[in-house]
């Protein structure tokens, strides 16, 4: 009997949507992302104060009524401590589950695309393990948008593309065939620039892609050592 009640509760439960809002320009948001934000009242936003997060500031420009929704801040601290991360992801899932149990959908905003290095996925996995339905809504990735802003391609013909998530894991000399994307490269820019110079690759960097403070640099020498957190580098094989 209890199992039947649990199944009925899940049948009546809300759905968790992981919605990508793109890298910065609200015009990059998809029609589906805009519709889901408009149609649902509970919006989860990664950060201690929802209104101060980058994801919220992007989305509210495209969906002004977002300001009147029930905003749920979700703490996602930047840490490499596995135990701390696990605890925060569990607590985030607990918060989301409270709304799903009450039959409310939750739209969880995430920068770029939720399938690319998004902490949202850790929450989704926990929600799915608890038996709830989830759905991913694609957004434009930062590296696709950055390539467009730099007016260049990422790959052509049969070229390979290597996407590296963070500079602290950059321990190679970029010597694999194909082109590289270095995400969130600002923390150790001096080290990154030296590796780029040695590689002999053609380099472009977009800082704060799609935002009011966006800047595009077309060579290693142009890139400042104090570039910001949202700095994305595209390093392409030099053309002979």
Across the structure, where does each feature detected by a protein language model lie?
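Short gly/pro/ser/thr-enriched loop/turn and capping motifs at secondary-structure boundaries
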Residues: 50-52, 79, 141-144, 211-213
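A short acidic, often aromatic-flanked loop/helix-cap motif at beta-alpha or helix-coil junctions
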Residues: 76-82, 169-171, 211-213
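Short beta-strand segments
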Residues: 18-20, 109-111, 164-165, 182-184, ...
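Structural signal for conserved beta-strand scaffold positions within catalytic alpha/beta enzyme cores
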Residues: 45, 72-75, 136, 156, ...
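Class I SAM-dependent methyltransferase SAM-binding "motif I" and its flanking Rossmann-like core
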Residues: 115-176, 224
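Short, surface-exposed amphipathic charged segments that create phosphate/polyanion-binding patches used
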Residues: 84-92, 149-152, 175-179, 217-222
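A contiguous loop/helix-start segment that scaffolds small-molecule binding in enzyme catalytic cores
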Residues: 16, 174-240
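Class I S-adenosyl-L-methionine
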Residues: 2-3, 7-26, 31-33, 38-132, ...
């Amino acid at each position: 009997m209890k199992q039947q009640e649990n199944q009925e509760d899940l049948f009546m439960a809300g759905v968790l949507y992981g919605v990508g809002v793109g890298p910065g320009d609200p015009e990059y948001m998809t029609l589906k992302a805009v519709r889901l934000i408009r149609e649902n009242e509970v919006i989860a936003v990664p950060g201690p104060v929802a209104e101060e997060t980058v994801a919220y500031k992007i989305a509210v420009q495209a969906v002004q009524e977002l300001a009147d929704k029930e905003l749920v801040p979700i703490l996602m601290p930047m840490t490499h401590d596995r135990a701390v991360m696990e605890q925060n992801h569990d607590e985030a899932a607990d918060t989301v589950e409270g709304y799903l149990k009450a039959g409310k959908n939750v739209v969880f905003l995430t920068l770029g695309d939720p399938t690319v290095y998004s902490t949202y996925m850790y929450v989704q996995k926990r929600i799915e393990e608890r038996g709830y339905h989830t759905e991913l809504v694609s957004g434009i990735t930062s590296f696709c948008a950055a390539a467009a802003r730099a007016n260049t391609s990422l790959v052509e013909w049969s070229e390979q593309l290597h996407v590296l998530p963070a500079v602290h894991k950059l321990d190679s000399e970029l010597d694999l065939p194909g082109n590289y994307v270095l995400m969130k490269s600002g923390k150790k820019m001096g080290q990154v620039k030296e590796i780029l110079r040695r590689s002999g690759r053609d380099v472009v960097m977009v800082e704060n892609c799609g935002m009011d403070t966006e800047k595009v640099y077309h060579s290693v020498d142009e890139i400042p050592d104090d570039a910001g957190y949202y700095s994305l580098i595209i390093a392409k094989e030099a053309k002979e």
